Structure formats: structure tokens, C-alpha cells
Design a protein with these regions (language model features):
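Short Gly/Thr/Asp-enriched flexible loops that form oxyanion-binding sites at enzyme active sites
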Residues: 66-72, 163-176, 522-538
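Class I SAM-dependent methyltransferase SAM-binding "motif I" and its flanking Rossmann-like core
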Residues: 161, 165-209
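Ligand-binding beta-strand-loop-alpha-helix segment within the catalytic cores
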Residues: 7-21, 79-153, 279
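ATP/nucleoside-binding phosphotransfer catalytic cores, i.e., glycine-rich phosphate-binding loops
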Residues: 2, 210, 216-311
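N-terminal glycine-/serine-/threonine-rich phosphate-binding loop
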Residues: 1-54, 350-351, 358
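A conserved mid-domain beta-alpha-beta active-site/ligand-binding segment of alpha/beta enzyme cores
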Residues: 558-614
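Active-site beta-strand->loop->alpha-helix modules in alpha/beta enzyme cores, enriched
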Residues: 294-371, 375-546, 580-585, 599-604, ...
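Glycine-rich N-terminal segment of FAD-binding domains in flavoprotein oxidoreductases
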Residues: 47-78
Length: 637
């Protein structure tokens, strides 16, 4: 299929889509996919034969790339919006238009303020109405859509409850614009935007399922690992009002545009051998044998020819060899990932080890997007590297200041006040900052953020001291892109790249460790990783980079699949406790976490259970039984 063509195609027409009920296309690059969607919208606007081209618009992080490209098309390619009318899907009830969390604010920030769309052609549900006014208003919203001939192109996102718009589980297929009570999961997902669940509205005004299905063309965006399960259910399972997005199966011109992580749970990607004939790459063979071991509930070396045949893997045996040979090969592949020497074991044959033996003492640079990602993700490995004599450096890429609660900041200010009783200038300054915290709802003032950043920095130093890591080998980069004081960050600038490149140039590491978990709900990990990738691409011409290997870890948000793991560092029970204690030095992140995501467990609990699960998976596959395992994947540049 031409990936540049988003034209609707009936699902199920070929073997690869036979389990699917909604047309979908997967892209490796979100920016590329967003640009193609924006181009389809632009073509619709330019080719519109009626007076107006009517757009249905969504909010949230998913469509931001599309809006960014539409702005570019307007400014650089003269795309005009004078013949466009827009209708937004929804709005929180009880928010004023000017509220920073309103969808009015969102749309003006990301699109409307940057294009020539007349203000009287913009329609967004009004969340500031009284409850008595809502019913009549919703009917008028529907009538207004109909008066323009209906929606030509509807852009959608999808929530964890499979809601589209704010159509929560239980919504009727024929529902129209109305007020709805928000599902607890939906409110939980919005909690970080509102600085706490208590401040999230309980109701919203939303276009109905029927309103959405009346659109002539629908495109739904799905980005990221956290959307994979609900997207697979929506695309492959039966229609049910328990999962409202499944109603889109009834639409004659609906396409889902996904990235690789969001489409990972679709049968054609998760178990392609059950869908069609496979091109058996090494990674796919690993994936299939791990899956078979789980299905058959047997360790790898006990899998039989019958197991392969009964679970749809006869083609693997036919093309790759006898089960006995496959089992031995896979067992060795896994065994060779395990090492207690993450920096390489000196004076040994390293042919079957994940890391080189030379040089025996390496310079190691660990990049940590937030100030605690290093110990959460690889605290046990850091301890091993230090104990085995390597020169370990940790670079904290961002200050993490917005993740410190006001209460935590006040506590440190009060400690400081009690330490400077005779210094009136300092006391006056601290009193002023305390007043700022008490009076300002969002606390984005530079002085407040500076103190919160200092809290995070002191915690890093304490954790490093516990691991016997010299403070001089801790590098606080404070990358400027992060310093907005808000969840939404700036795009990386030349300064961000320069700071990162200068540090790598200075240390000239033999190993770099970086966060490869792109499921971080606020995108900081992805931005930090992209900065590193860009810098590595620029630096690879330098001689010292020939001796540098890059390893990606995953932290509190996501784990590596077994078939992707290339280095597995086992932890003993004592090392698990050592790692836990290192994490607990980050006290500001222990109890009241500002941006916890959708997992309510504390970070140290998540990390511990994730490492234990990886060890259990290895053991189930026939490897030795360990208390925990930290896993890494090599990045080739």
C-alpha cells in the first residue's frame, strides 16, 4: 500500500487485515503521519465546491502535530481558511472560555491564533453556561452543524475508556450533542493538567456518537504505547457501547492513523504468524518463540514439534529448522543477554557477552531525563558499574522543578528560614517566595521554580552519595526546552543540543545509557532522547565515538519486550533493596507525586515490580531464577 495515500479501504479484503473491522495505517514517524493528515485537510479546503468546508476538530496531545502542519501550510504555502467553518467536539462544563485548561484556550494556542480563520466561523461548545441553558444550547449546536451541510472532515482522538469526544462508556449510537458526566478514568487522565484530581471538572458538553458518525470523513489519531490495547479492541472486537469508539466500525469512510507503538497490539503486528505468511526475521523468530512458550506454559527447551504446530507456527519450523534447533538457538540468545558485568568483564572472551571486555575501566555517561529516572530505571546497574571500577557520570537533562509540590517546597523554605535567622536579606527573600506560593495558583514564578529545582538537585546528590558516586560526576544540564513551568514544553533549541554535545565531547564515554521509554505521558523522555539521537548523529564522525556503545533503558512508564532485550543485568535481593533505598532519597517524589500518570503505584514500587516481572519472564523461559533484572537494548547510530 502507498503509505502517502490515506484513502479509505475496506478492512478485511486481504489476509493481513482479516481480523480488522476499521481501516488503519501505521507510520513509524508521527510527524510524517500528522503532515499527511494535514495535507488531506488542506486538499479538502482547496477543492471544496460548496461555500464552506466544515471541519470537526479534536483536542489533546494527538492532533497538535496536525495543527502545527496546518499553520505551516497557511504561512508557507498560502493555505487560506476563509472558507472554513470549524466545530469542536467538546468542552469541560464549568470552565470559562479564558481558563488555561479550556478547549477554547487550547484551540487558539495551537491553531486559531495562527491562521486566517474568521472568528465568527469558529464553534466550540460553551462550558460557562448555566445548567438550565445547556439543553437548548446543545440542540442549537446540532442545528448549526446541519445548517452548514454537516461536517466534511472529522478529526478524532481516543481515550483509555475508548471514548471519542467525551462520549463515555454507555453512550448510545444515536446520541447527539449533550452534557455528560465524565468517567473517573477520564478525570484521572486529566488530573495532571489541572494540578490534581479534585480540580478536574466532573461534567462536559460533547458532540454525540450520532453527531460524529454523520461526518462525511473521519480520521482518528492514535499515538503511543498507552493507546495500543484500546485501539486493538476498537479495531478488532465487536461493537459495544461499553467501548464507544467501536461504533466507528459502522462508518463508511473512517481511517485510523497510528504509530508503531499504538498499533503494537493489533494481530497483524502482535502475532503476524496467525494472520499471514511471515518473513522470518531474527526478531520475529524470538517474538514467536517467547509467545509460544507463554501459550504452551513451558520453558523454551521443552517446546515440541506438536507445540509449534498446534499454535500456528508450522511455517516457522518449515522455514527455519527443527524445533530442537530453534529451541537451542533461542535459549542461547537469551542466555547471552544476561551479565553481571554491565561495563564488560575484564580479561574474558566477550564473544557471547553483551559488552566488550576492553577497556577494562570505562567512562560511562548516564542520561536521566528527570532527576530520578537514573535510579528508577537502572539503579542496580549504576551500583554495579561503580563497584566494578568504572568512571560513572550522570547527566540530569531537566530540572524536574514542576514535579515538586508546593507543600514540599514550603517545607524546604521553612528549613532554610530556620538556618538564616540572622540574615534579614535572605529571610525577606524566603518570606516573599512563601507568599508567592500561597497566592499564585499555578506557581510558575521563577523564584518558586528555582527552589523546586534545588529540591530535586539535592535529592540527586543524596542518592549519588548513597551509591558512592562523586558529586563532581553529577551534571545538571537544566536543558532550556523544559523551563516553561508548565506540562507543555518548548521545542528543543540549538542551546539544548549544544549543552548535550559539549558534555559528551568533554567525557568521551565508552558507554552511554539513555531513557528509551517513550510512554512517558508528558513527552519529556521522548524530547530528551531525540536531543541525544541528534547529537550522536552529529558526533559520530569523531574518532572517540568509534569506541562508544549506546544502551537504552526503560523506566517507570514502560518495559522492554523480551525479544528486544540485548543486555539483562540481574539483581540479588540485597541489590534490590539497595536500588529501592537510592530511589527513596527522592523524597519529593515519594508520597504526593505531581505527575504520576495512570499508574497509582509509587515509582519505587513500579520499578521493583517491573524488574521482578522481567526476572520471572526469564525464569519462565528456562533461565536461572533471579530476584530482579534491569534490561537494556542497544542503539546503533
Amino acid at each position: 500500500m502507498n503509505q502517502n495515500n490515506l484513502t479509505f479501504q475496506l478492512p478485511g479484503r486481504n489476509e493481513s487485515t482479516r481480523f480488522e473491522k476499521i481501516h488503519n495505517i501505521t507510520y513509524d514517524n508521527v510527524a510524517e503521519a500528522s503532515a499527511l493528515i494535514a495535507q488531506e485537510i488542506a486538499n479538502g479546503i482547496r477543492n471544496c465546491k460548496s461555500e464552506f468546508y466544515v471541519l470537526g476538530l479534536a483536542t489533546g496531545s494527538s492532533p497538535i502535530g496536525v495543527y502545527k502542519e496546518l499553520v505551516r501550510l497557511h504561512k508557507e504555502e498560502n493555505l487560506t481558511f476563509k472558507n472554513v467553518v470549524t466545530f469542536n467536539l467538546d468542552e469541560y462544563f464549568g470552565l470559562k472560555i479564558e481558563d488555561k485548561n479550556s478547549y477554547h484556550s487550547f484551540m487558539h494556542t495551537h491553531l486559531f491564533d495562527h491562521i486566517n480563520l474568521p472568528k465568527d466561523q469558529i464553534y466550540i461548545p460553551d462550558g460557562s453556561l448555566s445548567e438550565k441553558e445547556v439543553s437548548a444550547y446543545c440542540l442549537s449546536y446540532e442545528e448549526k452543524i446541519e445548517s452548514f451541510g454537516g461536517i466534511d472532515f472529522q478529526l478524532l482522538g481516543i481515550g483509555r475508556t475508548a471514548h471519542i469526544g467525551f462520549n463515555e462508556p454507555g453512550s448510545h449510537i444515536n446520541s447527539i450533542t449533550r452534557m455528560i458526566a465524565l468517567d473517573p478514568i477520564t478525570r484521572e487522565d486529566a488530573a495532571s493538567d489541572f494540578n490534581g484530581l479534585n480540580f478536574v471538572p466532573t461534567k462536559a458538553i460533547t458532540m454525540g456518537i450520532g453527531s460524529i458518525l454523520n461526518a462525511k470523513r473521519i480520521v482518528l489519531l492514535g499515538w503511543g504505547h498507552k493507546k495500543a490495547a484500546v485501539l486493538a479492541l476498537t479495531i478488532e472486537k465487536e461493537i459495544t457501547n461499553t467501548y464507544p469508539a467501536t461504533f466507528l466500525q459502522n462508518h463508511p469512510n473512517c481511517t485510523f492513523i497510528l504509530d508503531a507503538e499504538a498499533s503494537a497490539e493489533l494481530s497483524k503486528h502482535k502475532t503476524p504468524w496467525l494472520v499471514k505468511e511471515c518473513d522470518w526475521t531474527e526478531r520475529l523468530i524470538k517474538k514467536a518463540i517467547v509467545w509460544l512458550s507463554n501459550q504452551a506454559q513451558k520453558p523454551i527447551l521443552k517446546l515440541t514439534n506438536r507445540d509449534y504446530n498446534e499454535h500456528g507456527l508450522s511455517s516457522l519450523v518449515a522455514s527455519q529448522g527443527l524445533p530442537y534447533e530453534l529451541n537451542i538457538w533461542m535459549f542461547n540468545q537469551l542466555q547471552h543477554t544476561i551479565t553481571g558485568w554491565p561495563g564488560g568483564k575484564p580479561n574474558t572472551d566477550d564473544k557471547n557477552r553483551p559488552e566488550r571486555s576492553d577497556p577494562a575501566k570505562k567512562r560511562v555517561l548516564i542520561f536521566s531525563p528527570h532527576p530520578d529516572d537514573d535510579v528508577i530505571s537502572m539503579g542496580g546497574t549504576i551500583a554495579r558499574l561503580i563497584e566494578q571500577g568504572h568512571e560513572v557520570h550522570v547527566a540530569y537533562q531537566t530540572s524536574g522543578n514542576i514535579t515538586v509540590s508546593d507543600e514540599e517546597a514550603l517545607k524546604f523554605i521553612e528549613v532554610a528560614e530556620n538556618s538564616f535567622l540572622k540574615d534579614k536579606t535572605t529571610l525577606d527573600h524566603l518570606q516573599s517566595v512563601k507568599q508567592d506560593i500561597n497566592l499564585n495558583e499555578n506557581n510558575l514564578l521563577k523564584e518558586v521554580l528555582s527552589i523546586k529545582g534545588a529540591v530535586r538537585k539535592s535529592e540527586c546528590i543524596a542518592a549519588g552519595r548513597f551509591l558512592k558516586l562523586p558529586t563532581k560526576q553529577l551534571h545538571f544540564l537544566n536543558l532550556p526546552f523544559y523551563e516553561t513551568g508548565k506540562i507543555i514544553k518548548n521545542e528543543p533549541s540549538a542551546t539544548d543540543y549544544k549543552i548535550t554535545q559539549e558534555l559528551i565531547d568533554k567525557i568521551q564515554p565508552h558507554q552511554i545509557f539513555a531513557a528509551g521509554d517513550l510512554a512517558d505521558p508528558h513527552g519529556t523522555h521522548k524530547t530528551c532522547l531525540n536531543i541525544i539521537f541528534k547529537v550522536l548523529d552529529d558526533l559520530k564522525v569523531k574518532k572517540y565515538m568509534d569506541a562508544c556503545r549506546v544502551w537504552l533503558y526503560r523506566s517507570a512508564w514502560q518495559a522492554w519486550d523480551i525479544e528486544d532485550i540485548e543486555m539483562a543485568v540481574p539483581l540479588s535481593p540485597d541489590q534490590v533493596i539497595q536500588k529501592r533505598n537510592a530511589i527513596l532519597f527522592h523524597q519529593s517524589q515519594k508520597d504526593k507525586v505531581m505527575f504520576q500518570g495512570k499508574d497509582n503505584r509509587e515509582f519505587w514500587v513500579r520499578a521493583e515490580q517491573r524488574n521482578q516481572t522481567t526476572a520471572e519472564l526469564y525464569n519462565h523461559l528456562g533461565m536461572a531464577e533471579y530476584a530482579a533484572i534491569e534490561a537494556f537494548k542497544q542503539y546503533l547510530f
